[in-house]
Design a protein with these regions (language model features):
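PLP-dependent amino-acid enzyme catalytic core
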Residues: 1-315
Length: 315
């Protein structure tokens, strides 16, 4: 669990870089809950990752940053690091899985980041080990860095500022850094609020871990929900995540696609696959009733894929 003081300090630290995003109501007839959307897709990089990346980089010393920055990311953390590196005049090396969407890769390059593609298993090994062969810059772990998690936790502070009494907060689960950060803030200030995670059923590692009582490998099937889900919950994250999560959900990819369409039609919001996971959980009723806050974690989706989904594609 991240200390509340660290999250509150992060809010001050990142104020010049990250946007205080709105919390808006999603009005849908016969919805099973009173659904609210925390629109992190409106950040400068269209993802919440700017929060954690900025906080972690600002916590590092000038000497630590001098050789440049390195991270491993499916795309959004990469953009956060590249954004901050450009602002500081530093080089950034980004290691991505070879299935990363072109929209995210183009954004990394546009921000000045140097992209290195790896097969998924090799990329996942970087996540596990925190090491990239052939680089000597400051490695910013996209998940388990305490500064990253504290920055992510600022989302929880903003949610409670706008809606002090949510019944549940639904968080898309990728590596666990967003969940630990947000849940730490919520547990400290609103302990009665349920913490619910959502993963694509094609890569529901947390669901499997909770069922088994420990991290366990699952079959990973790539889908357009590329920013969430994994082969296995990181051993380092399991003791942090497990006590904070009240329910873990596996969402069918077709329901995520339907949520992408609903957000576009009803509130003119563009969500990537991971960003639509939480709304999908709420719209299907899996997240429960009452006031349900859904974190729309990002909006970096290939426009061709978005067009396909808006046209009725289910995966």
């Amino acid at each position: 669990m991240i200390e509340l003081a660290a999250i509150e300090a992060a809010r001050e630290r990142i104020a010049g870089a990250a946007v205080r995003t709105p919390l808006v109501r999603l009005h849908v007839e016969d919805a099973p809950a009173e659904i609210y959307l925390k629109l992190e897709n409106l950040q400068p990089i269209n993802s919440f990752k700017i929060r954690g990346a900025t906080n972690a980089i600002m916590l590092a010393s000038a000497a630590e940053r001098a050789k440049g920055l390195v991270t491993a990311s499916a795309g959004n953390m990469a953009q956060g690091v590249a954004w901050a590196a450009r602002a500081l005049g530093l080089p950034a090396t980004i290691v991505v899985p070879e299935h990363a969407p072109e929209a995210k890769l183009a954004a990394i390059t546009r921000l000045g980041g140097q992209v290195r593609k790896l097969p998924y298993d090799d990329w996942w090994n970087v996540i596990i080990t925190g090491h990239v062969d052939g680089t000597d810059g400051l490695f910013l772990h996209p998940v388990q860095d305490p500064g990253v998690m504290a920055g992510n936790g600022t989302i929880g502070l903003e949610i409670l500022d706008d809606l002090p009494d949510p019944d549940a907060i639904v968080i898309p689960y990728g590596g666990g850094g967003l969940t630990v950060g947000v849940a730490s803030a919520i547990r400290a200030l609103s302990p009665q609020t349920r913490i619910v995670t959502a993963e694509p059923e094609t890569a529901a590692a947390l669901v499997a871990a909770i069922g088994a009582g420990q991290p366990t490998d699952v079959d990973y099937r790539a889908s357009f929900v590329d920013g969430s889900g994994s082969r296995c919950v990181l051993d380092s994250m399991w003791p942090l995540v497990a006590p904070l999560v009240d329910a873990a959900l596996a969402i069918p990819v077709a329901e995520v696609a339907a949520a992408v369409r609903t957000l576009a039609e009803r509130v003119r919001v563009i969500a990537e696959g991971a960003g639509a996971l939480a709304p999908a959980a709420a719209l299907t009723g899996l997240a429960g009733t009452g006031k349900v806050v859904c974190i729309v974690s990002g909006g970096n989706i290939n426009l061709s894929k978005l067009a396909d989904i808006l046209g009725g594609a289910t995966e």
